[in-house]
Structure formats: structure tokens, C-alpha cells
Amino acid sequence: ELLEQGKEEEAAKLASEAEAADGVQVEEQDTSSIDEKRKALPKEAKYLYKYLSVNPAGGQIVNILQTIKMDSNRTKNLVVLGLHGFGLANIGEDFARTYLDLGWCKNAAKAKISAKGINSASKDKLTGAMNKLKGGCLIIENAGLVRPDKFKEIIELCAPEKSDVKIILTGEKVALSNMLADNMSQARHFNNRVYFDQIQEANMVDIAKGYMSEKGYKPESGMSGTIKNLLMSMETGNIDRLLKAVDDGIARAEARDPLSKKLLKADIQ
């Protein structure tokens, strides 16, 4: 079993908490709640641990994975809604990795494309791309700008009976919500939604430090302050840019000492 017996009940409780938290700004994160969410997830979801402090996203992540586990016929397509039309692709990639490890994707292949790229591509080009991606994941950035005709087209090409590609839409909350509302026939394929539009500075710090741990690195004492300083030069909620800064820091640490697995504050710039 991918999930231990009894976790479904725990996940249902967490999902209720997440729904109650929707629309509420939380100033302090309850670490016990984060631990509960983490325990409710299978080990294959380790790439998603770093996002669990975000409300309501953390509870929604647990709920989505548990719901799909209990209902194998449920769509695995996903919508990630944030503050911008950019900066969320890494979340989509982490879901793609999780889907692969859980056996929900049959192919490790994943591709990122912008709404502009979808809109400008011919049907033949999209068909060829989806055939190459067969069994994998497609992440569409700034998806609120996808044209209705191209949205319908890509859903048809990615259907289980065709290329069986899981679609992950990312984008700004209002634009993406409106796009789905204007395309109700297609929107029924996207019942799994995760909201990152209430993300706060403390969540961004948690994500960065969680990513360091995920990569096997131990941060120097006082790293939280360094991350906060880094965030001052970034758009609020731009997770992609934050994780790129951590990757760059890890590259500096490896160049300095490839064995210590120690990340210094000076590495994060």
C-alpha cells in the first residue's frame, strides 16, 4: 500500500482544517500541524514536504493525494494558483516527481511550456510533443492566458486513451480561475486545486530551508535571516526564483567543499 491504513481519516481531518483556513491569513505556523500533514503523506511525496507550511496549500496537498489514492478514477490533472502567472513551475515539477514515484505517471518525462507557447503551436506540433511525452507530465505556466480552443485541444491530446499525459496548470489565481470558469466543459478535468496565493515570508523561508534539506544540505545557523534578505529582491511568492537561488548556493558550496554538505550564509546570494 502506498499509504498506511488509517491515514485516510487523518487526511480528511486535515482537509477540513485547510478549508477552514482558506481566506484566513495565519501569522504563526503551528509546527505540530506541519508534522501531522507530513505524516499523512506517503514517502513518495517527499518533494512536497517543503510546501506544507503554506496555508491553505499544505492541507490541500494532503487532501489531493489521499483523494486520488481512494478514487483511482479521479483525474490527476492539477491546478496551482498563486500571486503571479509565473514562479510556480517547480511546484508542478515536484508533483510530477511525486506522481511518478507513486506510479500515477508511467514516464519520467516532463515538459514546461508557457500559455504563449501553447497558443502559438500548431495542432500537429502539439500532437508530436504529446506523443513524445506519453505517460508523463505537462506543466503549463501562466495558464490563465491559454485560449479556449487551445485549452480544449491540449486536453484532448493528453487524454488517457491518447497520450495519457497529466496536465498541471500554474498561474495567477484570478486569471486562472476565470479561464476555468469560462471553459466549464474542460474545467471538469481539473478538480484538484492548490492555492498558494496566501503565501507569506515565513513560508518562503520554510520552503528554502526545506529544499536545502531535500538536497542533503545542512544550513549554517542564522540562515533564516539570510533568506529573508534575499526575498527583498524577489516578487512575493516567486518560488521558482527562490529555489534557483538555493540551487546556485548549493553549487557554490559544492565548489568550496564537495563533501561537507554544509551550506553557508555566504553561499546564498
Task: Please annotate each region the language model reported.
Residues 17-49:
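Conserved ASCE P-loop NTPase core motifs with emphasis on AAA+ ATPases
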Residues 204-268:
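Conserved AAA+ ATPase small/helical "lid" subdomain
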